[in-house]
């Protein structure tokens, strides 16, 4: 099971997330994101056994692999328009998708991604927008699902109940400012998520 906190920019926030039970830490390498970090900054942040996830948007596979080497990533989370031919060959992939009412899981049937990370719809934004989606849509999928988008301690149990996911992910709803985690909100989210997932 995955308990992920995304948009980590400091060692302090990473330590607090892991202490509260996070099993995956997300670093954003999309330059237009307010949570952007360089590969060197990410490399300097230790994660004590939690999976290291890099967020990318329409980045060249060779560049993803280069950043993964520098930052010691375990997973590439691809948020753009990437198809299987754009996946980095040497890295586990989580493919992010924005869920709309007519979302079709069949488009990912041939995807070699380890999981689909489902996010709420948000025009021109690639994650971190804080929008939820209809979690019941995820329950019908045969894919391994990570639910993201607008999650915090107040709603993660309901999301797990309706979506039956492999994991959950939160970013903007547990911040005091973009790129700066609110430790109490983050801790409350992770504790609620652990209880809901039976982790």
UniProtKB/Swiss-Prot annotation:
<dbReference type="GO" id="GO:0004640">
    <property type="term" value="F:phosphoribosylanthranilate isomerase activity"/>
</dbReference>
<keyword id="KW-0028">Amino-acid biosynthesis</keyword>
<dbReference type="GO" id="GO:0000162">
    <property type="term" value="P:L-tryptophan biosynthetic process"/>
</dbReference>
<keyword id="KW-0822">Tryptophan biosynthesis</keyword>
<comment type="similarity">
    <text>Belongs to the TrpF family.</text>
</comment>
<dbReference type="InterPro" id="IPR044643">
    <property type="entry name" value="TrpF_fam"/>
</dbReference>
<comment type="pathway">
    <text>Amino-acid biosynthesis; L-tryptophan biosynthesis; L-tryptophan from chorismate: step 3/5.</text>
</comment>
<dbReference type="InterPro" id="IPR001240">
    <property type="entry name" value="PRAI_dom"/>
</dbReference>
<dbReference type="InterPro" id="IPR013785">
    <property type="entry name" value="Aldolase_TIM"/>
</dbReference>
<dbReference type="Pfam" id="PF00697">
    <property type="entry name" value="PRAI"/>
</dbReference>
<protein>
    <recommendedName>
        <fullName>N-(5'-phosphoribosyl)anthranilate isomerase</fullName>
        <ecNumber>5.3.1.24</ecNumber>
    </recommendedName>
</protein>
<dbReference type="InterPro" id="IPR011060">
    <property type="entry name" value="RibuloseP-bd_barrel"/>
</dbReference>
<keyword id="KW-0413">Isomerase</keyword>
<keyword id="KW-0057">Aromatic amino acid biosynthesis</keyword>
């Amino acid at each position: 099971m995955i308990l992920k906190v995304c948009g980590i920019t400091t060692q302090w926030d990473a330590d607090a997330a892991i202490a509260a039970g996070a099993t995956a830490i997300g670093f954003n390498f999309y330059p237009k994101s307010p949570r952007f970090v360089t590969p060197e900054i990410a490399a300097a942040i230790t994660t004590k056994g939690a999976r290291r996830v890099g967020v990318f948007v329409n980045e060249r596979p060779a560049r993803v692999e280069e950043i993964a080497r520098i930052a010691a990533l375990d997973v590439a989370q691809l948020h753009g328009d990437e198809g299987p031919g754009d996946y980095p060959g040497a890295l586990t992939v989580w493919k992010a998708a924005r869920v709309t009412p007519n979302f079709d899981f069949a488009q990912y049937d041939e995807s070699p991604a380890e999981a689909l990370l489902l996010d709420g719809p948000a025009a021109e934004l690639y994650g971190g927008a804080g929008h939820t989606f209809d979690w019941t849509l995820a329950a019908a999928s045969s894919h391994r699902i990570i639910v993201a988008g607008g999650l915090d301690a107040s709603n993660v149990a309901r999301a797990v109940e309706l979506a039956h996911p492999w994991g959950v992910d939160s970013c903007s709803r547990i911040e005091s400012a973009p790129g700066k985690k609110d430790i109490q909100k983050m801790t409350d989210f992770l504790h609620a998520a652990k209880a809901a997932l039976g982790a």
